[in-house]
Amino acid sequence: MKHVFILNPAAGKGDDIAPLTLKLESECKRLGVDYFIYLTQSPGDATEFIQRECAEGGKFHGETCRFYACGGDGTISEVLDGAARVEGAEVGVIPIGTGNDFCRVAVRRANFILTSRLR
């Protein structure tokens, strides 16, 4: 399975996402998982990225992918929209937005351990 992290650098307070990127890379390498990190450029980019790269000729065509929305509610919405059109796609969330309303309502677990989700 390919683990695709879609990070929105504008999410939250616009803090530097380099530490998160480095942590994701470090954990994926340590666990030996196949991963890809993508930084969104503009609104709607996450949906377009997923659709483009999962289509024939795209880098993920024919692969089973888990897409991680790393951002706020808007990023989650875009990733869900893109992944809903990809057969067999899975979605995970790493909330780094300001409100994170989706996670407050939909996620009951307070402790999220990324490494347990990467296996």
Predicted regions and their residues:
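Catalytic core of DAGKc-family lipid kinases
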Residues: 4, 30, 65, 84-119
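Phosphate- and divalent-cation-binding pockets in alpha/beta enzyme and binding domains
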Residues: 45-48, 78-79, 101-102
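ATP/NTP phosphate-donor binding region
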Residues: 1-67, 117
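Short Gly/Thr/Asp-enriched flexible loops that form oxyanion-binding sites at enzyme active sites
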Residues: 75-87
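A glycine-rich beta-strand to alpha-helix segment
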Residues: 64-70, 74-78
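Glycine-rich beta-strand-to-loop/alpha-helix junction loops that act as flexible
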Residues: 9, 70-72, 94-96
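Gly/Ser/Thr-rich beta-alpha loop segments that engage phosphate groups in nucleotides
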Residues: 14, 73-76, 97-101
